[in-house]
Amino acid sequence: MKLLVVFSLSILLFVVPTSAQEKHEAMKPVNITEISVEVEGGKTVKMKAADLAKLTRKEIKAKDHDGVEALFSGYELRDIIAPAGAKLGKDLKGPMIAQYLVVEAADGYHAVFSVTELDPDFTDKVVILGDKRDGKPLENWQIIATNEKKHARWVRQVTALKVRLAH
């Protein structure tokens, strides 16, 4: 019996580092060249940096994961999802209030925002797809959300923005 326990523990010692290593591998920088913007009932648009550059840049001050204040710049999510058909402004009423945005990352991480959280008619909160911090380029696009106590929705390596309607 003791031999079985020792054998089982020794296997765990070899398995755990592999799992941690796999997790670390998934966090390595990737070169993301476009973001897919998809709106249920609308269309799917592929946006590259040149497409985003046509939008109005927004700068916001926010504290990063370590609590250090920085100046982030990028593009408001509402400006990115609107061309694909997301309902905002005067059209964000009735059943459209149930729209939500799923942010997807290269490593499989997901976060969700209500579309009302992105609309200035509903909130003063600002959520951007950031590409710079203190004037220096970020490795990949990242979600930056003001006034968040936790940074669980600060998705890194963003690959897709998908607007859905809760039914």
Segments (PLM) and residue ranges:
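Bacterial N-terminal signal peptides
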Residues: 5-15
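N-terminal intrinsically disordered, low-complexity segments enriched in P/E/S/T
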Residues: 21-167
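Sec/Tat signal peptide C-region and signal peptidase I cleavage site
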Residues: 16-20
